From Swiss-Prot:
Record-linked PANTHER family: SERINE--TRNA LIGASE, SERYL-TRNA SYNTHETASE
A Gene Ontology biological process term: seryl-tRNA aminoacylation
Associated pathway: Aminoacyl-tRNA biosynthesis; selenocysteinyl-tRNA(Sec) biosynthesis; L-seryl-tRNA(Sec) from L-serine and tRNA(Sec): step 1/1
InterPro entries recorded: aa-tRNA-synt_IIb (IPR002314), aa-tRNA-synth_II (IPR006195), aa-tRNA-synth_II/BPL/LPL (IPR045864), Ser-tRNA-ligase_type_1 (IPR002317), Ser-tRNA-synth_1_N (IPR015866), SerRS_1_N_sf (IPR042103), SerRS_core (IPR033729), tRNA-bd_arm (IPR010978)
The name this protein goes by in its record: Serine--tRNA ligase
Catalytic activity line of the entry: tRNA(Ser) + L-serine + ATP = L-seryl-tRNA(Ser) + AMP + diphosphate + H(+); tRNA(Sec) + L-serine + ATP = L-seryl-tRNA(Sec) + AMP + diphosphate + H(+)
Family stated for the protein in its record: Belongs to the class-II aminoacyl-tRNA synthetase family. Type-1 seryl-tRNA synthetase subfamily.
GO MF, one example: serine-tRNA ligase activity
First-level EC class: ligase
Residues noted as binding L-serine in the record, renumbered to the chain: 231-233, 285, 385
Amino acid sequence: MLDIKFLRTNFEEVKAKLQHRGEDLTDFGRFEELDTRRRELLVQTEELKSKRNEVSQQISVLKREKKDAEALILEMREVGEKVKDLDNELRTVEEDLERLMLSIPNIPHESAPVGETEDDNVVARTWGEVKEFNFEPKPHWDLATDLGILDFERAGKVTGSRFVFYKGAGARLERALISFMLDLHTDEHGYEEVLPPYMVNRASMTGTGQLPKFEEDAFRIESEDYFLIPTAEVPVTNMHRDEILNKEQLPIRYAAFSSCFRSEAGSAGRDTRGLIRQHQFNKVELVKFVKPEDSYEELEKLTNDAERVLQLLELPYRVMSMCTGDLGFTAAKKYDIEVWIPSYGTYREISSCSNFEAFQARRANIRFRREPNGKPEHVHTLNGSGLAIGRTVAAILENYQQEDGTIIIPEVLRPYMGGKTVIK
């Protein structure tokens, strides 16, 4: 959520920057109307309440003096009715303004490339050499099915499309990656490990920006009005909702493993095979709470931490600086890390690393004090995948495949795989 005072005094500037996102700003124009009416109603209500108090005191004086107060009593009733009507209108206007504020996306940072679609994203850097095969490489779903380590068909029978059973060495590889990533981020990168709930309430989804705009993308448990988490970002960020932190606590860095659940409502027909786009998948998420002046330095560090996973796995990748039209709803700046997938002949996203500045913190009311009695300020929040496990499995299977259909296990994972060197 944007700062309403900043929006009020910089309306045209904010509008111009939001236009770079390619957003429909039809409703945005209502801000000035609603904000002005709200302030008018507040003034009118306070004036009438003050008058009501004044008349009430006059009535008390007349009654003490045994004088007729009927005219003033009628006047006070009329004032009371007007106050009631204005309070009702004020409540409606404030609710409309709140809904509008929750629907306005974040302002892009000045360093985000201006553009409309993913075609306008900018390559920040690449790492590693794309492997040249002397045979026709297979897609990971064929490799895994032939090896008996992933079972899409039975998962489809048990649940439906976009689900999978991991079996044998496939399950072991998934578990190895989870442990490897958590060990790296906690032991070397300084994050504290968190194992979060997989269900959250509506306030949590609103705090991180999934609601109200993207409710159709979420799995909801209607009987409790809980949501299955689309990412560990949601519960971990909301750990500190409605809290005031001390500056000594910052930066706070969490690494959280969780399963994630997404309806993929807008992805019909895309990536229908394999692990790239599943309704349920595992991920290690990195979440930070930092002082505002440190957030862009911390974004670079967070992105480097996610990159380190791919470097140790020796998987070629590139880092994309996302343009203003491809930032998503909540980010002020975002990097996507894309890993090379041979069967696609291109790079595919395996991590998004974002700086939300105070956008989430304002929605979730997460603040800090620089001094013991100082005025609370909103923290800046950041998060990034470190990494998406299923897509990492897909990248390993495809990049490490051999002509005979076996898979070489990356050296860094072998201690987690019981010393095995090959999946066969």
